[in-house]
Amino acid sequence: MKSSNLYSKLLNAPKNAPVFLSQNLEADFIVKAYTFGLFPWTSKPVTWWCPDPRCILIPNQIHIQKNMKKFINLYQIKLDYDFLKLITLCRDTRSQSWIDDEFITTYYKLFTQGYAHSLELYENNELIGGIYGLILGKVFFGESMVSIKKNASKVAMIKLCDLLKPYDFIIDCQVYNQHLEFMGAHNISRKEFLNILKEKCNQESGFKNFKDLIT
C-alpha cells in the first residue's frame, strides 16, 4: 500500500480500538509501522493501535515538581546498558502484560539494529527502573516504563527529556494518563500527530549514538 493511501486510511481508522491485527511481530514491519503512528499493544493476535487523540511530551515542557528534585540525582543513569534486562523487568513487574517472549525477542533485535534504546536507573548497581522505546529521526516512541524504587519512572522521564532537549525531539507517550499529564504531556489529534511524524521521522536525530549522550 502506498504511503499516501495508508495515511488516508489511518485518518479514518477507529479512534479507540485496534486498527488491524497480525499473527506475528516482525522487526522490519515495526519500524515502518511506527513512522505511521502505529504500535502493538497485545499479542496473539498482535493488535495494532493508532489512537485519536495521541499523547505526546515535548522535552522542554517537562514539569518537574519540587518534591522530585531530591530524587533526580539519587539514581545512576545508564543508556543502552542492559536493554534486555530492562524490558524483562517491565514484563515481570506487571501481573498482566502484553510483553511476552516474542515481544522481548523482537524488540531486542530492534535494539541490536540500533532502533530500540533504553534509559536505565541503578541504585547500588541494582536496576530499579527506566524507560525504553524506539528512536526514529527526532521522535522517541516510548514503549514502557518501570519503577521499583520511589519515583524511578518519573526520574527516567525527566532524564530522558533533559537528554533530548537540545535535539528538538518529541516523545510519543501513546495514550493519555494523569501521571503523564502531571509531567507535562498533552493530547493532540491523530492528524496533527501523523503530520509531525512525516516531518520528524525523516530528520537526522542530531547525535550519532544514544548511549553517548551521557559521558
From Swiss-Prot:
- Class of the enzyme per the UniProt entry, highest EC level: transferase
- What EC number is given for this enzyme? 2.3.2.6
Indicate the principal place this protein occupies in or around the cell. Answer: cytoplasm
Q: Which GO terms describe its biological process?
A: protein catabolic process
Q: Which GO terms describe its cellular component?
A: cytoplasm
What is the annotated localization of this protein? Cytoplasm
- Report whether Cytoplasm shows up as a keyword of the record: yes
Presence of keyword Transferase: yes
Task: Enumerate the UniProt keywords alphabetically.
Answer: Acyltransferase, Cytoplasm, Transferase
Q: Which domain of life is it from?
A: Bacteria
Family annotation (InterPro entries):
Acyl_CoA_acyltransferase, Leu/Phe-tRNA_Trfase, Leu/Phe-tRNA_Trfase_C, Leu/Phe-tRNA_Trfase_N
Named from the GO MF annotations, one term is: leucyl-tRNA--protein transferase activity
| Intrachain disulfide bonds | none
Q: Write down the chemical reaction(s) this protein catalyses.
A: N-terminal L-lysyl-[protein] + L-leucyl-tRNA(Leu) = N-terminal L-leucyl-L-lysyl-[protein] + tRNA(Leu) + H(+); N-terminal L-arginyl-[protein] + L-leucyl-tRNA(Leu) = N-terminal L-leucyl-L-arginyl-[protein] + tRNA(Leu) + H(+); L-phenylalanyl-tRNA(Phe) + an N-terminal L-alpha-aminoacyl-[protein] = an N-terminal L-phenylalanyl-L-alpha-aminoacyl-[protein] + tRNA(Phe)
Free-text function comment from the UniProt entry:
Functions in the N-end rule pathway of protein degradation where it conjugates Leu, Phe and, less efficiently, Met from aminoacyl-tRNAs to the N-termini of proteins containing an N-terminal arginine or lysine.
Instruction: Name the HAMAP family for this protein.
Output: Leu_Phe_trans (MF_00688)
Q: Which NCBIfam families match?
A: aat
Which family does the record assign? Belongs to the L/F-transferase family.
Record's protein name: Leucyl/phenylalanyl-tRNA--protein transferase
* Gene designation: aat
